């Protein structure tokens, strides 16, 4: 188990000592490494459980140095954290758009979806604390989260966005930090 802090450009209690835009992208390039970037304490606990149970793969945690808002979840959502990605916000109907986020950007994405709902825009938010674990899920599960051929996808992460192209496709977009 490897633990990394300073997971993004976010400022924490220790000030602007380093803003790691490259850390997540670099870690995700390591073959066989599962990289977890949890959004809150429930996701952190689920990631720890997976790390303890894992006997075959190394695990890296990319933890925020900021205080993160706890995101309300159902029991089903909590159990789906271990799948690496799950629907954290959305009523289950056909969304107008899907936002995929990790870490501190999940609560921001949920807040944006709540504001857009007031304007009649239906947004599904996927929290994806671990891309590698999510990619090992069944096609049926992945299609429940992000339907195949769905074009209106936005990935949000405060780091280099290279690893999100495979999820947003050619018509999707990313909000990421490529330099600072």
Pin down the residues of each PLM region.
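A short, small-residue-rich loop immediately preceding and capping a beta-strand
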Residues: 1-3, 101
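Thiamine diphosphate
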Residues: 10-20, 53-180
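Beta-strand segments within the central parallel beta-sheet cores of soluble alpha/beta enzyme folds
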Residues: 3-5, 39, 123-128
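Conserved thiamine diphosphate
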Residues: 5-54, 90
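Alpha-helix C-terminal capping segments
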Residues: 1, 28-30, 167-169
């Amino acid at each position: 188990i490897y633990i990394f802090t300073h997971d993004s450009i976010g400022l924490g209690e220790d000030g602007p000592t380093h803003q790691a835009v490259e850390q997540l992208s670099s870690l995700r390039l390591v073959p066989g490494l599962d990289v977890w970037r949890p959004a809150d304490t429930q996701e952190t606990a689920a990631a720890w459980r997976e790390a303890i149970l894992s006997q075959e793969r190394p695990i890296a945690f990319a933890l925020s140095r900021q205080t993160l808002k706890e995101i309300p979840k159902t029991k089903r959502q909590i159990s789906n954290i271990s799948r690496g990605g799950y629907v954290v916000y959305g009523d289950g109907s056909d969304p107008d758009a899907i936002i995929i986020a990790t870490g501190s950007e999940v609560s921001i994405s949920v807040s944006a979806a709540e504001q857009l709902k007031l304007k009649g825009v239906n947004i599904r938010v996927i929290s994806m604390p671990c891309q590698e674990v999510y990619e090992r899920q069944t096609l049926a599960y992945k299609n429940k989260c992000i339907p195949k051929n769905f074009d209106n996808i936005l990935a949000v992460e405060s780091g280099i966005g290279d690893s999100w192209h495979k999820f947003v496709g050619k018509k999707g977009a990313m909000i990421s930090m490529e330099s600072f």
